[in-house]
């Protein structure tokens, strides 16, 4: 667990550095012109900070998964999440289905097939895994019937709720210096097509279900150390909220509090004593 906590700390630091760069350094790059060291660091950070925070988030959740539910389950979920999300993204950037017409810029690292940054499936994994483990803890602690179904549905919802606040900001026209992707069509949700949200929810449902069914037996998440997946999830939602506020999208930031952060906090409730889950 110490390894996972270390990667979480680095992940949060990288997110903070990235946010500072986006809202302060990037719009004022001229201030570094007279300082070659600052300019060199800026040049490195603008290319690599996003990659660092995605990799550290991935490593934090991999380490947590191995420590909490075992290497086999963690590997199965990793493969399901990365392969299915990469397939969806490659299909989406070519055909416009299931997310709508869009293309990635060069700010998220090297691209698979020249279209999808290789870091994108990793972000699907670590946020999807965190969302699903939080959902398992919430559903099992509340002793909800049909635990398998509702943990998958809630996990996919928490993942999609992150998109509600992240995507409009990342592609906002007010991000005048750098965009992470560009929409080829206009939609009613702050410029995004609604099918992007449906595609995000559907992709999450598919890979979360695939990863979970590969486990065969359920996990008992009631006494899981939920603070770590919550830390990963909350850090990324708060980062997206800060970016949204920086470009004037306060409605999406408020939506993130109500639809993602508040529901996720229920995973921090202590578990009540009860019978073990069926094998």
Name each region found by the language model.
Residues 1-279:
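Aromatic-rich, lipid-facing transmembrane alpha helices and their immediate juxtamembrane interface loops
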């Amino acid at each position: 667990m110490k390894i996972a906590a270390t990667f979480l700390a680095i992940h949060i630091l990288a997110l903070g550095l990235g946010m500072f760069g986006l809202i302060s350094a990037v719009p004022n790059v001229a201030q570094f012109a007279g300082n070659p060291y600052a300019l060199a660091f800026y040049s490195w950070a603008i290319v690599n900070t996003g990659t660092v925070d995605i990799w550290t988030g991935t490593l934090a959740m991999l380490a947590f998964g191995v420590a909490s539910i075992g290497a086999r389950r963690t590997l199965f979920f990793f493969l399901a999440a990365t392969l299915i999300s990469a397939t969806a993204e490659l299909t989406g950037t070519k055909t416009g289905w299931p997310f709508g017409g869009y293309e990635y810029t060069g700010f998220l690292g090297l691209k698979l097939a020249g279209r999808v940054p290789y870091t994108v499936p990793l972000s699907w994994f670590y946020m999807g895994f965190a969302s699903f483990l939080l959902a398992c803890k919430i559903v099992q602690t509340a002793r909800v019937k049909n635990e398998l179904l509702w943990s998958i549905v809630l996990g996919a919802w928490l993942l999609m709720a992150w998109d509600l606040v992240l995507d409009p900001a990342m592609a906002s026209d007010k991000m005048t210096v750098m965009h992470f992707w560009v929409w080829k069509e206009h939609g009613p949700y702050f410029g995004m097509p609604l099918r992007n949200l449906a595609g995000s929810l559907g992709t999450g449902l598919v890979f979360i279900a695939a990863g979970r069914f590969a486990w065969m037996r359920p996990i008992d998440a009631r006494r899981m150390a939920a603070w770590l997946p919550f830390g990963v999830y909350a850090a990324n939602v708060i980062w997206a909220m800060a970016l949204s506020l920086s470009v004037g999208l306060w409605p999406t930031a408020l939506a993130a509090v109500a639809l993602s952060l508040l529901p996720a906090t229920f995973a921090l409730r202590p578990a009540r004593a009860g019978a073990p889950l069926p094998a």
